[in-house]
Amino acid sequence: MLVAGQFTLIPDSAFEQALINLGIDNALDGVVASSSISAIDTLIISNSNIENLEGISGFHSLTYLDCSVNNLDTLDLTVNYLTFLDCSGNNLEYIDISNHLALLTFKCNYNEFSQLDVNANTSLLYFECYENQLVSLDVSSNIFLTELRCNANQLSYLDVEGLDMYVLVCDNNQLTTIDNLSDNVSLKFLSCSNNNFYSLLLSAHPQLNWVSCSNNQLFQLDISSQAGLNYLFTWGNPSLNCINVSDVVVANATWSVWDGQSGNIDGHHYFSANCSISSVNEFKDCKKISSVFNMYGQETQLIKNTPLLYRYDDGTIQKKLILK
């Protein structure tokens, strides 16, 4: 038992020292008076060299916990009921937060998670899990989610069906598309650089203010519906030529060529109000097709009378419309 009579055991001296620094405890003796912690609702003990949070169960009223930047390998919060949790910057591989039904903010960046289960956290509004080892992420139950930052993982699939987020950051993954992105009509900030996107159609997101899609394999980019777009980064997409916009004059005046330190677009990119198939560079047909994608970046079969993206065995990509 962690709670022994009138005292709660705190075996980690760094944890207890953090409590002393906060005026919650008064002596480094391995225990804290249970009456001193039972009513505490907020505990910020970040960057304290803590290796073990045994004793946290004695904080019966705790709703806000920041234990980031410590040396935790495990974190047992099964008897707490949090609305805010930041456990970023530890060595965690597993965490059970299924009992935190009122959790609104969850930050677990810079850990070693390969999977996370947030299905029970249906009230979640803000979710950060970047710089982990996630190979999958299910947010289908988090219908109130407004901000998701899952960059720098190993995700090859991301479905945001039924959500309406304001912010989505998914850079540095292995994504070729984001399923049901169009559901998120309130999206204002999208950052998806350093992935494998072939196409990015954003007509369903007129409120976008920021789009960063650098270092992909984009062949098509349509930002013609984003009248309020102030920030655009498309460099590092060698197969992208024409960027569809509503006002070419404004686009040319707003965004400049990337020079290695600053800028927005590659030198061969240009803006047009009507990027057509004829604007695409033609390739020789002797190359072997390795895969075919639709305009949403999803792999598909050959379909006549439908514009598709053809990836060849030499790595080049071609947009073609094959007529009957």
Where are these regions (language model features)?
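N-terminal capping/linker segments that flank leucine-rich repeat
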Residues: 1-64, 101, 122, 143, ...
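Leucine-rich repeat
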Residues: 58-61, 78-83, 100-103, 119-124, ...
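C-terminal tail/sorting-segment detector
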Residues: 307-324
